[in-house]
Amino acid sequence: MTLRRRGEKATISIQEHMAIDVCPGPIRPIKQISDYFPRFPRGLPPTAAPRAPAPPDAPARSPAASASPRSPSDGARDDDEDVDQLFGAYGASPGPSPGPSPARPPAKPPEDEPDVDGYESDDCTALGTLDFSLLYDQENNALHCTISKAKGLKPMDHNGLADPYVKLHLLPGASKANKLRTKTLRNTLNPSWNETLTYYGITDEDMVRKTLRISVCDEDKFRHNEFIGETRVPLKKLKPNHTKTFSICLEKQLPVDKAEDKSLEERGRILISLKYSSQKQGLLVGIVRCAHLAAMDANGYSDPYVKTYLKPDVDKKSKHKTAVKKKTLNPEFNEEFCYEIKHGDLAKKTLEVTVWDYDIGKSNDFIGGVVLGINAKGERLKHWFDCLKNKDKRIERWHTLTNELPGAVLSD
């Protein structure tokens, strides 16, 4: 403590003032901060202390006496023990040699850390899980998607809940007809839809190259709908006519290759039935339905109808037209037309089927078409000959629409 003479005002140094505030009572010297935090290398405990020099009159220890029994593994620890002794002596005051240090406890093996890449419970906790099943009906060229339920979805609204729905998207394909969705369930994180959505016109080729994207979204009346999570199922994993059930963790949104979508985009599919009726002495052409049609209107839909034309037709009396279906890309027509013709003349004929978008006040838009007949190829030729060979038997086939028909009149 700083001393003062008689008559002088008492003064206290800053160090004494701090010591009094921190530790009332007798003032003791303030230790250096290094006394509280000695420097040791990481992983080396401060258990070793420097050995005091031996007194001059102490008998010298023989190397044999100073040596202790060692195991072969001790040799690998020589350097570590030397470092312990060296850094254990750092900053320590000299003193008598300590007694034998207690044996070190065996080091605990490091605990296994969760594998971030393979640890799925984080995503499950954050986004939720989805239960659904898929069935490919090979005979009817249909893919049935049953959306069962979801659990533990991520809250998206201010009330801590969500308004979830499920959206399906066949990839590749940018057409709006490739997208289907369930109804929306309000204020729930554990929705049960139990709803089946069906894609028609699915071929074996589609099952090899296409992938089904299943997204769970939150519907918002005042803003854009929000994405919650998704999963993707390559259709080649499915066996024909066999229901496969899934229970998966939703994942974060993955990018869609827009260039690939455009390059493989189609004009749509059409289901046509052919039958030569011996009773009516004519060809019965059935326009059953279309699927995945290209959108021609600004609202993202079309108002489609179908025309059929049996060529060549000198009198131009063979044109038939279905009714118009409003605002749809997957219309169902179920209409049939009869062409009176001898069976032997069919081999010389060509059936032209075109799909159009109806517009009021302007020209109708051509969506796509297909030609069946002697000059066709692949499935179109096979469908025509199967009809000729099997009288009085209705044969249905799906055909892909193209935007170019050689020799066709593409105006309505």
From Swiss-Prot:
Disruption phenotype: Mice are viable and fertile without gross abnormalities. Residues 257-375 are annotated as: Mediates interaction with STXBP3. Ca(2+) 1 binds at residues 157, 163, 218, 220. Residues 112-123 have a biased composition (Acidic residues). One of its GO terms (cellular component) is presynapse. One of its GO terms (biological process) is spontaneous neurotransmitter secretion. GO terms for molecular function: calcium ion binding; calcium-dependent phospholipid binding; syntaxin binding. Its main location: cytoplasm. Residues 38-123 are annotated as: Disordered. It is found in: Cytoplasm; Cytoplasmic granule; Cell membrane. Residues 43-58, 95-108 have a biased composition (Pro residues). Widely expressed. Expressed in pancreatic islet cells (at protein level). This is Double C2-like domain-containing protein beta. It comes from Mus musculus.
